[in-house]
Amino acid sequence: MAINHIDWAIKAENDWKVVKLIIANNYDPEDILCYHCHQVAEKYLKAYLHYKSLQQIPIHDLLKLLDKILSIEPGFSILRSKLKILNLYGVRPKYPDDYFAPLKSDCEEAIGASKAVRKVCRKFMKLDKKKLK
């Protein structure tokens, strides 16, 4: 089975569900909340690459994914500052060797950034009014 943009968008939505669950749990655990905010953005950017039939790049760096997208869609440039925020949470929260405890304000910033990325990606893929399973 060939993977397409909808498959990636569904995975991103699953991460978004986790974000909402952690918000409902009073932002606990904060590090995992921020990690899943990054995952929402990463998977939606990869969904867009699939949507445009661009070669997938196996990286977690959101700014590098953005640069690839900008080669065909300059409208994504509005996300650069949001992706810069989220890039802080792609790898670091996953490992115990560098204790990482974001503040509630960091969480709120990450949530806002991932929400913006989600909205833009869904709009460009014409998924903004579509419910994904």
Residue ranges, per PLM feature:
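Terminal alpha-helical segments
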Residues: 1-133
